[in-house]
Amino acid sequence: MKKVILGLVAIAALVSCKKEDNGNDSTIQEGTFPKEVTYKNENGKVASKLVSLIEGGKILSSEMEIYNENGSPIRTQKDIITYEGNLIKKRETTGTGDDPNYNSFTETFSYDGTKLVKSVTDYKKVVKTITTIYSYDGDKLTNMVKTEPIQTTENGQRVEGTKYTETNFTYNGDRITVKEKTYTKKPSGFITDENTSFKIYTVVGGNVVKKEVTYSPSAKETIEYTYDTKNNPMVNNLTKIILPDYFIEKSRGRNNLLTATITQVRNNQTFVSKEYYEYVYNDKDYPTSQKHFIEENAQKKPAGSIEFQY
């Protein structure tokens, strides 16, 4: 899990090389990419910092450092990026700290033109490979299938099976229905641990404005989002290539998130909560800082902040 969190944060910054949608150009325009990103917790203490090296319009490397409550580094992650043309071919990650086994891995990417069709993550210190295959209908992502090894039992013995995560996308105007099915296949081919979930996203103007999740007939959740009209450094042509399902992520909309209203219904009871985001912008309409608040007892309580240096 720690590797996943680190990996998501690093690749989120990695692909935030903003350039206006101009064909399939995925190089970086000077002044629009945050070369240094600092994350602070609700108490204003630095939780992590990410610094990237950029040359020739490309990110060549990045380094993330994670800190404890006392400000001491507890974990680092260093990335070396290689390209094929303007597309990322490989990301080699070396991690140190409390969980180096899952912080050290290599990701390789395969394309059909500029469409990502396969990504493979190989861990360096544990024997584990995760593969994701992507399918499209024209320019629309229709299916993702992720496979990874998992320990299971068969005939009373511990054996290695394969966990599948199949994600299907169905489009109907502004609404996108995402069906996710997970299951484990044992060496004999027997399938177990099946689970299916549905989420509906409403996307308007390049932003997710609503997310609807049904957990059971008596448990549902709806999240409604609002945005500013400024530039979001986390969305660009490279984002759309390297993260094909970017369009269902609230943080990867065309603009920056302002509010999130979460309505949960459980056993005929309704619970509502809100989150807020405040920004300071530079003269190019990119955020230089983001403050995150949660509503508690009708008051806004700090929940963390981010600082961007371009």
Each model region followed by its residue ranges:
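Sec-dependent N-terminal signal peptides
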Residues: 4-12
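C-terminal motif of bacterial Sec signal peptides marking the signal peptidase cleavage site
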Residues: 14-16
